[in-house]
Design a protein with these regions (language model features):
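Membrane-interface helix-loop junctions and terminal tails of multi-pass membrane proteins
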Residues: 1-104
């Protein structure tokens, strides 16, 4: 059970931070300029950099999926045990909801 809680926490935090980065950088980009192209570039760079850091931090703990469809694909390909899939999906969804709430 100890490992399951580590996986759960890693996916929850990673998903939460990823959504906070995406939403937060989008909100900041809107305040940066009126040029939509510049907004998209700023949001993309921030999201890519944030995702790189999150994958670096959480890859060794949970695989850094941060997305239910990635976890499902990993289960189908045999890289994630079926019994862990519900923990991953719940953690990711809860993390995303918390992240949106904190970013707004």
């Amino acid at each position: 059970m100890k490992n399951k809680s580590r996986y759960f926490l890693a996916e929850l935090l990673g998903s939460c931070f990823l959504v906070m980065i995406i939403v937060g950088s989008g909100l900041m980009a809107e305040n940066l300029t009126n040029d939509v192209a510049v907004m998209l570039i700023a949001n993309t760079i921030a999201t890519g950099a944030g995702l790189f850091v999150l994958i670096t931090v959480f890859a060794d703990v949970s695989g850094a999926h941060f997305n239910p469809f990635v976890s499902i694909a990993m289960t189908i390909t045999g890289k994630l045990k079926k019994k862990l899939l519900p923990f991953y999906i719940i953690a990711q969804l809860v993390g995303c909801l918390i992240g949106v709430g904190l970013a707004n």
